[in-house]
């Protein structure tokens, strides 16, 4: 085969072939399949189909099939020469959480059930949580980002002081952090990684919801490396199941924490959470399971049974309850989703 004769090499039927100037397919491998036999009054059309690896899916308006035209261009009927992309699958853990896997002490052991869970370590070795929402971005709380920093710290000051792990203690490098413009009332920040993380059984983003899953009574799952009953950070990822609580009851429980002029807060944990239209509460279960210091930044993960997909309904903001208070407080993802999408697109 001359250099002028072969203009493109392609993979057909699992084997390498070449297309010459006459649009004829020639087998250029040593042990390849023979080319298809000819038929009367017909011809062989050369086409390829793009497919994605495990844990990725094809994103295209076409069907992924491209045909070689007379001008030696690979064309899809719907999108022309625009190539498809492989995007990460979200919210489809290989080993989803099983509510029967209860262990004594209230927390539940997680074995790959929450591949979106990241572990963030701030200055002075304080552990907090973060949630992977695509291959390169994570959500966490603004309070987590400001740990051991003054209120005057900037995002550029904060980013180099953080250490982040995904999957099975896989260290990833942080490029930047972005704080919500109203982070004093909307306790949220974004983390951008320097490189996209490969998605696999242990590392997978959770999906962002298209509707509000924070309905009273709905059960969600919260994972994390927060402190245990002995007030020590756990070495193993744990999770709990918690129901969404009535917001009015939650506000009454914290006794006026939304009214700044009250001088004597009466929170059962001595700290007042942010409670407003951007938050919801989840109640402690009858097994006295709860979130605790270090769990903030983790997702309130809801399993949509119809879609068999896991969504982040909220991000844990107030993790100080530790089975003392009845409610943890979460930032609604639907309240911040526009900001998240615009920030990611801008950066």
UniProtKB/Swiss-Prot annotation:
Residues 103-347 form the Peptidase S1 domain. The keyword Methyltransferase does not apply. Residues 31-88 form the Sushi domain. The beta chain mediates most of the interactions with both subunits of hemoglobin, while the alpha chain forms the homodimeric interface. It comes from Pongo abelii. PROSITE patterns: SUSHI (PS50923), TRYPSIN_DOM (PS50240). GO terms for biological process: acute-phase response; defense response to bacterium; immune system process. It is found in: Secreted. InterPro entries: Haptoglobin (IPR008292), Peptidase_S1_PA (IPR009003), Peptidase_S1_PA_chymotrypsin (IPR043504), Peptidase_S1A (IPR001314), Sushi/SCR/CCP_sf (IPR035976), Sushi_SCR_CCP_dom (IPR000436), Trypsin_dom (IPR001254). One of its GO terms (molecular function) is antioxidant activity. It comes from the Eukaryota. Residues 1-18 form the signal peptide. SUPFAM superfamilies: Complement control module/SCR domain (SSF57535), Trypsin-like serine proteases (SSF50494). As a result of hemolysis, hemoglobin is found to accumulate in the kidney and is secreted in the urine. Haptoglobin captures, and combines with free plasma hemoglobin to allow hepatic recycling of heme iron and to prevent kidney damage. Haptoglobin also acts as an antioxidant, has antibacterial activity and plays a role in modulating many aspects of the acute phase response. Hemoglobin/haptoglobin complexes are rapidly cleared by the macrophage CD163 scavenger receptor expressed on the surface of liver Kupfer cells through an endocytic lysosomal degradation pathway. Pfam families: Trypsin. GO terms for cellular component: blood microparticle. Tetramer of two alpha and two beta chains; disulfide-linked. The hemoglobin/haptoglobin complex is composed of a haptoglobin dimer bound to two hemoglobin alpha-beta dimers. Interacts with CD163. Interacts with ERGIC3. Residues 259-264 are annotated as: Interaction with CD163. Gene3D superfamilies: Complement Module, domain 1, Trypsin-like serine proteases. Coiled coil: none annotated. The keyword Disulfide bond applies. The gene is HP. Disulfide bonds join 52-86, 90-207, 250-281, 292-322. Belongs to the peptidase S1 family. This is Haptoglobin.
């Amino acid at each position: 085969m001359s250099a002028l004769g072969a203009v493109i090499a392609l993979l057909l039927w699992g084997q390498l072939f070449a297309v010459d100037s006459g649009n004829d397919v020639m087998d250029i491998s040593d042990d390849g399949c023979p080319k298809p036999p000819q038929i009367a009054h017909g011809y062989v059309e050369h086409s390829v189909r793009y497919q994605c690896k495990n844990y990725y899916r094809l994103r295209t308006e076409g069907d992924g099939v491209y045909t070689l035209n007379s001008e030696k261009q690979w064309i899809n009927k719907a999108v022309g020469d625009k190539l498809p992309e492989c995007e990460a699958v979200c919210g489809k853990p290989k080993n989803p959480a099983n509510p029967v896997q209860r262990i004594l002490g209230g927390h539940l052991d997680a074995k790959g059930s929450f591949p979106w869970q990241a572990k963030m370590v701030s200055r002075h070795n304080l552990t907090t949580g973060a949630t992977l929402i695509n291959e390169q971005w994570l959500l966490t709380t603004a309070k987590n980002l400001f740990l051991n920093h003054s209120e005057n710290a900037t995002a550029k000051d904060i980013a180099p002081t953080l250490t982040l792990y995904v999957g099975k203690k896989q260290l990833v490098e942080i490029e930047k952090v972005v704080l919500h413009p109203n982070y004093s009332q909307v306790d949220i920040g974004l983390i951008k990684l320097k490189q996209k993380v490969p998605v696999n059984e242990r590392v997978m983003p959770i999906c962002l919801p298209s509707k509000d899953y924070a309905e009273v009574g709905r059960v969600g799952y919260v994972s994390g490396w927060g402190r245990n009953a002995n007030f020590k950070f756990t070495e193993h990822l744990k999770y709990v199941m918690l129901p969404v609580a009535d917001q009015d009851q939650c506000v009454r429980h914290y006794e006026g924490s939304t009214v700044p002029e009250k001088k004597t807060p009466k929170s059962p944990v001595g700290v007042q959470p942010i409670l407003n239209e951007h938050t919801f509460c989840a109640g402690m279960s009858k097994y006295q399971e709860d979130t605790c210091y270090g769990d903030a930044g983790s997702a309130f993960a809801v399993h949509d049974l119809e879609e068999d997909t896991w969504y982040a309904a909220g991000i844990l903001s107030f993790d100080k309850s530790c089975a003392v208070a009845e409610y943890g407080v979460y930032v609604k993802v639907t309240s911040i989703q526009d900001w998240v999408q615009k920030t990611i697109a801008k950066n």
